[in-house]
Amino acid sequence: MKVNDVELIIEGAGPKVIVMIHGWPDTYRLWDPQVDALKAGYRCVRFTLPGFDRSAPRRAYSFAELLEILRRVVEETSPGKRVILLLHDWGCFFGYQFAMRHPELVERIVGVDIGDAGSRENRAELGFRGMTIVLVYQLWLALAWKIGGRLGDGMARWMARTMRCPTDPRTIGAHMGYPYAMRWLGAGGGLQGVKVFAPQCPMLFMYGKRKPVMFHSRRWAERVAAQPGSRVIEFDTGHWIMVQRPRELNEAVLGWLAS
């Protein structure tokens, strides 16, 4: 099944649909362990973000274009029923923005390691050192996208190694950096109209504590945990919890969805 030239991988059976959205520098394969655990009771829908496939031409998608693709994916895979979003990294960013604009389409949200990243509270907790780390790696990847070619690919892979990214380096390239170029270089029209995420439905937020910087603020996590039906879980991992602790993450997701 295709939506806007985006190939959807659909597995599993069940009355509810889980839409899985990855981030940098991953593909739909990031969610393999989660699909294995969830497909017995849920219909799992996943795809590689537009522009992240190495076979696709290097380009920046507009913010509105990406949200429209998400809307079509949700409506065409779960007609008339709300979905559960399972999100990581840039998938969190785009999924959160989508959920705030289309609350009628989203029943629950599982967010992995990205919360209110970039908010005033998050920036205050990061401090100068943390903000510098974020600025350096994000600008590096934005420039890698802009440069492209072998040099840009090399820059992207070097950053992935530096960040101890578990993704197969053969799949990583400069083309995946366009969300950073959207943020810092205005590519695709930039990120106009972005709102700080405040969940309007039950949410499970999971984050790894072993990272140079946090992508959420403590107060935001406290507010999420205080919402009815929501939960916050800390893992002794880095950014890629689903790779480092797949069994524990799967158990947390299944338990929360069943509650």
Label each residue range with its predicted role.
Residues 73-77, 252-259:
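C-terminal alpha-helix
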Residues 19-23, 88, 207-208:
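The conserved beta1-alpha1 loop
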Residues 11-54:
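Conserved HGGG/HGGXW glycine-rich cap/lid loop of the alpha/beta-hydrolase fold
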Residues 237-246, 250:
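Catalytic histidine-centered segment of alpha/beta-hydrolase-like enzymes
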Residues 2-11:
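A short loop-to-beta-strand scaffold at the N-terminal edge of the catalytic core in hydrolase folds
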Residues 45, 52-86, 93-229, 237:
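Flexible "cap/lid" subdomain of the alpha/beta-hydrolase fold that forms the substrate-access gate
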Residues 26, 61, 65, 244:
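Residue-level signal for the nucleotide or nucleotide-sugar donor/cofactor binding architecture
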